[in-house]
């Protein structure tokens, strides 16, 4: 008995020394790598101590110490995301508790074991230690996204929250009286309960966003909890997402604003706000949100909620559900910069768009750009980015810079172009003569379209420079590439992208038609500038067939007819053109495959004057 008492005191002292050192290191070590190394050491030391304690048969006198060491060990396991190890140890501990009480476990189901263990220690000094372990089991379930287990144990969780304060206060009073005999815990269970409560509310809220007002009420209640500001911000963020699902976008924006007021580093709130502005078609507000989001993403990483002072467990350990991760995900800084550039160009802020594109290309070329390697895969392919940037430069009246980017595209793709591309249907792309569809064959059309688009943009550049001969040459190069694509007519509309499983292939076919229409229109307009009117009329007519929505082709077709003294036909053509609205730039197709109105323009007032002089048609 004397030896047993000596062992108990020795083991208690060892636990207290380890716990004190662990708590001190947790507060003083800011380096995550060093912190992880120390956590591994502490969990190993606690586990060694636990094996010594469990090396002799379980006894009630040593149970309090054993449960404390189990708690400390499991906290260290959990801090290292070793949830399986923590759960196994917790299950074994619940079984040993029942052995001490003289009850046969009868099952390994954690819920049954914990209910039986709680019942066996009710009214005893071990009750608060078992409650502490139950906290950790709760955390493990939450970390492993086993929300059904948490929900099934809701009654016990409520009891835990209600009783823990009084029980642990009694424990602290007892600890002050017999500090050397009471095992120290590395983490105050009350802090753990507070952390788990709000993390549970956040995870459950993310899983139940579509349930409406009931979820919203729970999230609003959680927002009043004592918790780190980052977690409170998440409750506001989820409230906003819930309201967005309920088709209340303006109320959702208010919640996102609360999230940012609570924690200015909550970048996902900016991103969700941008999505709401896009839904509301408020392009200027969306651009502003994207600009701020990009600036924040360039700062050191602040996407994870910070640990509270003195807390060994990061909230991110318990926020691992797929639904929540999806809601909290934010595109990379480069992806946001690309979206910002495209939005600016499409919505008339061309100079800003150009600067964004140039910044993006510079970042992609810089080996030292933060996060660039992780972000590249989420961006369009580099030739497409060059073409988008080239289109923006063309709109900004910078033809020389546009041509330089197009030369880069042509140089990187020209030697890889197939001799011919045969498309059997919108979902099938193959090079003529090949026996099977290969990745190379599927990419053949894409590379051909990139090269053709580069020649098209260069034709536009020479048109801006009024070098009509070079413009005709480059438009012809574009057309010569496009006629290499052969396809069977299956009734598929090539004017707008389709929305089926082959949408990407459908977009490529739509781009093909647009490039045909635009290059024929460009060459026809260039022919008109050098008075080759018959050739101009032919190309403009073909352009109208390939791209009926083209405004420039229709207007210049009328102009050429007028010059050929077919004035009645010209008047009818212009009247039809004015009766149709001028389409604006769209995100449905690449910007370089849309009408940029960068070439010579016809004055509408002069055309109307001609019609008036002609008289009634």
What do these predicted ranges mean?
Residues 1-617:
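Non-TPR docking regions that flank or precede TPR/alpha-solenoid scaffolds in eukaryotic proteins
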